[in-house]
């Protein structure tokens, strides 16, 4: 039986619509608390404690209170971190030896949305079986713990300071950021009180933007999903580099002094090159089905095995763990470095990139010399719900024709949307005209076969 509420990154939706309602979130806290209360540590007499962090959406107050009430009713103590990046909650949960961590955030989505995601005691996302157990408890009646067993709540006053020190600890002690002017865009999100301090305390001249949240402006024209604001600020301030985080600070985009934007694919290559220079070799790297072919080719030139996971940082993480590798990324800016953190961390990833530039005494453009991203053409084709596009001979013929013409110098990727009756047709080629021509030919075949 499939999961009803948990997606690939927790539970997410529009606030006020199921399941992101205060009554459901209270029951979710209770259900998660009952699952935690059944662990071996609790059975041995320890009282479970969870950490709750959130981003800056106005709905965070309501959902935080609902979660807190649910955990308390289940006999679970709560620590409240306040605004805290998702990776900060993961780190603090592990560092404080807590039973679990909870993040109230919808990441890069607008303020009208929100979500709940959980971390296990070791700072990793919950395994499927634990999420299934929580969903099973949601069907049971809420039976409040007796008064002497109710959970207590308190604020973790030094949460931000602890996480700032952790982030700084991932930057090599032999270097600092003195002499660098950095624009830091916090998306009016969870990192607005944290990220500027990290880079400033390492010596950088920091120009912060996106640091005035009002509950309604998270990701609104700023942050990693709207990098134009960062480009403008870098140019206007003659900065050396710009770093944009998203609402919960688990992803980033980077802009150099010329205004050139670097995505997660390119930053992955930079980090691999840095590891080769410092460690001698890299066992392998993981991207996704959408990772630009030019990066795969460049990694092959360096002798680094490359594996493509399904789209989503959860799947990149699965592949890294399965192979015992350290480095992975999505083009959207989720970067994983498992020897630094258990989850994607925009601030830590930025520090890794800055360390690579310091060690090499080169710019990003210089480190990526010879790596030119292949043009990609993406066409979304609407089709009838339930249309059998996989069984269409004409679509298969169009794909085969494109792949034959590209002959190893490009890629064709066809995948269905998970939320609407749309087929996404992506073609990547060395020449933009070739990518467009083949994508349009396949899209035409899809329209004819599925309309």
Curated annotation (Swiss-Prot):
PROSITE patterns of this UniProt entry?
A: PGM_PMM (PS00710)
* Similarity comment text for this entry: Belongs to the phosphohexose mutase family.
What is the name of the gene encoding this protein? Answer: glmM
One Gene Ontology cellular component: cytosol
Tell me what reaction this enzyme catalyses: alpha-D-glucosamine 1-phosphate = D-glucosamine 6-phosphate
Question: What PTM annotation applies here?
Answer: Activated by phosphorylation.
Q: Name one GO molecular function term.
A: phosphomannomutase activity
Q: How does the cofactor attach, per the note?
A: Binds 1 Mg(2+) ion per subunit.
Q: What does this protein do?
A: Catalyzes the conversion of glucosamine-6-phosphate to glucosamine-1-phosphate.
On whether Magnesium is a keyword of this UniProt record, the answer is: yes
What biological process terms from GO does the record include?
carbohydrate metabolic process; peptidoglycan biosynthetic process; UDP-N-acetylglucosamine biosynthetic process
Q: Which organism is it from?
A: Burkholderia ambifaria (strain MC40-6)
Q: Note the PANTHER family from the entry.
A: PHOSPHOGLUCOMUTASE (ALPHA-D-GLUCOSE-1,6-BISPHOSPHATE-DEPENDENT) (PTHR42946:SF1), PHOSPHOHEXOSE MUTASE (PTHR42946)
User: Is the keyword Transcription regulation in the record?
Assistant: no
> What's the Enzyme Commission number for this chain?
5.4.2.10
Catalytic site residues? Answer: 107
Give the UniProt keywords, A-Z. Isomerase, Magnesium, Metal-binding, Phosphoprotein
EC top class named in words: isomerase
Q: Which residues carry this modification: Phosphoserine?
A: 107
Q: Which residues bind Mg(2+)?
A: 107, 246, 248, 250
Name this protein carries in UniProt? Phosphoglucosamine mutase
Named cofactor requirement(s): Mg(2+)
């Amino acid at each position: 039986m499939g999961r009803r509420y948990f997606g690939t990154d927790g539970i997410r939706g529009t606030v006020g619509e199921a399941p992101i309602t205060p009554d459901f979130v209270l029951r979710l806290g209770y259900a998660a608390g009952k699952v935690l209360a059944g662990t071996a540590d609790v059975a041995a007499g320890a009282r479970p404690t969870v950490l709750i962090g959130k981003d800056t959406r106005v709905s965070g107050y309501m959902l935080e209170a609902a979660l807190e009430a649910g955990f308390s009713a289940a006999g679970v103590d709560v620590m409240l971190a306040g605004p805290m990046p998702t990776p900060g909650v993961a780190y603090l949960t592990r560092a404080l030896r807590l039973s679990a961590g909870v993040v109230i955030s919808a990441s890069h989505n607008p303020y009208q949305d929100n979500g709940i995601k959980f971390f296990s005691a070791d700072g990793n996302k919950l395994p499927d079986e634990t999420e299934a157990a929580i969903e099973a408890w949601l069907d049971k009646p809420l039976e409040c713990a007796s008064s002497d067993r109710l959970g207590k709540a308190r604020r973790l006053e030094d949460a931000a300071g602890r996480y700032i020190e952790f982030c700084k600890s991932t930057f090599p002690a032999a270097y600092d950021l003195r002499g660098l002017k950095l624009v830091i865009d916090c998306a009016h999100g969870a990192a607005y009180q944290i990220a500027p301090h990290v880079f400033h305390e390492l010596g950088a001249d920091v120009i912060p933007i996106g640091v005035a949240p009002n509950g309604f402006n998270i990701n609104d024209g700023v942050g990693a999903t709207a990098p134009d604001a960062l480009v403008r600020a870098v140019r206007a301030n003659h900065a050396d580099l710009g770093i944009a985080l998203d609402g919960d600070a688990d992803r980033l985009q980077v802009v150099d002094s010329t205004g050139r934007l670097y995505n997660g694919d390119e930053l992955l290559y930079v980090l691999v090159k840095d590891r080769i220079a410092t460690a001698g070799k890299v066992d392998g790297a993981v991207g996704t089905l959408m990772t630009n072919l030019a990066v795969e080719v460049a990694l092959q030139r360096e002798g680094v095995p490359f594996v493509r996971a399904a789209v989503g940082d959860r799947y990149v993480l699965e592949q890294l763990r399965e192979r015992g590798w350290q480095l992975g990324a999505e083009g959207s800016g989720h970067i994983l470095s498992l020897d630094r953190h258990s989850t994607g961390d925009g601030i830590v990833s930025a520090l890794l990139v800055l360390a690579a530039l310091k060690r090499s005494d080169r710019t990003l453009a210089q480190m990526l010399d010879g790596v030119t991203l292949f043009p990609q053409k993406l066409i979304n084709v609407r089709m009838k719900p339930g249309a059998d596009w996989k069984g269409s001979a004409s679509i298969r013929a169009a794909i085969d024709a494109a792949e034959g013409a590209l002959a190893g110098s490009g890629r064709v990727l066809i995948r269905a949307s998970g939320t609407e009756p749309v087929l996404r047709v992506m073609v990547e080629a060395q020449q933009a005209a070739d990518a467009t021509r083949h994508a349009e030919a396949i899209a035409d075949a899809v329209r004819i076969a599925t309309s």
